[in-house]
Curated annotation (Swiss-Prot):
Binding-site residues for substrate, renumbered to this chain: N12, K14
Protein name: Triosephosphate isomerase
InterPro entries with a match to the protein in the record: Aldolase_TIM, TIM_sf, TrioseP_Isoase_bac/euk, Triosephosphate_isomerase, Triosephosphate_isomerase_AS
UniProt keyword Isomerase, yes or no: yes
């Protein structure tokens, strides 16, 4: 990664955890000694956000895994950015492939969520990525551009872009044990950075962090972290294990 962009590692617990399990994970994170040049985020299930935020060191961000596109109302089962902020959290993950595929979230809905979250003062990890069939059909760039265009159409200022981290997560590599090679990851990340140079305000391409998600482990993280345009990771299953600490230290 570029030395001008702070390394970023997010741990997405997904629909996992219990109060007892969380306590163990939080203890291990609290005992670890992280370098100040890495930004760390934990995305916990909604019901645990308050407790996780109160238990973790303030240097570690706590994020929600989703939110809705309006401030309040008759939307059973949804939560708003203001609710996330009300329990002391300042980040949200939006557009994760599981939200897109399982819950049929469209590019436009994801973009509207990003727009509202930013307007309400949250920072956003915005996820994009292609399926295996799309990659095999040579549509990786087309899919990523389609997803990014929807988001970019809702973000007008460089100040808002400063609160966005883009997570490239090839869907075929999530939870499968398959992982994009360092070369494959760098190729897509470099393409995305060039896209930002052409399609967003001047300077966004160099300051925005593009992180990789997809079966990241302690075994493969160091080589991935050495790629110029890979600015960190969005970690799923491994964030529930002790090796998450090693992944957070990939740049040390």
């Amino acid at each position: 990664m570029s030395g001008s962009r702070k390394f970023f590692v997010g741990g997405n617990w997904k629909m996992n955890g219990s109060r007892a399990d969380n306590k163990v994970l939080i203890h291990s994170l609290s005992e670890a000694h992280f370098c100040g040049d890495t930004e760390i985020l934990i995305a916990a299930p909604f019901v645990y956000l308050n407790e996780v935020r109160q238990s973790l060191a303030k240097e570690i961000h706590v994020a929600a895994q989703n939110c809705y596109k309006v401030p309040k109302g008759a939307f059973t089962g949804e939560i708003s950015p203001s609710m996330i902020k009300d329990v002391g959290c300042d980040w949200v993950i939006l557009g994760h492939s599981e939200r897109r595929s399982i819950f049929n979230e469209s590019d436009e809905l994801v973009a509207e969520k990003v727009q509202h979250a930013l307007a309400e003062g949250l920072s956003v990890v915005a996820c994009i990525g292609e399926t295996l069939s799309e990659r095999e059909s040579g549509k990786t760039e087309e899919v990523c551009v389609r997803q990014l265009n929807a988001i970019a159409n809702k973000i007008k200022s460089i100040d808002e872009w400063k609160r966005v981290v883009v997570a490239y997560e090839p869907v075929w590599a999530i939870g499968t044990g398959k992982v994009a090679s360092p070369g494959q990851a760098q190729e897509v990340h470099n393409f995305l950075r060039k896209w930002f140079k052409t399609n967003t305000p001047s300077g966004v391409d160099q300051q925005i962090r593009i992180i990789y998600g997809g079966s990241v482990t302690a075994a493969n993280c160091k080589e991935l972290a050495q790629q110029h345009d890979v600015d960190g990771f969005l970690v799923g299953g491994a964030s529930l294990k002790p090796e998450f600490i090693d992944i957070c230290k990939a740049r040390q």
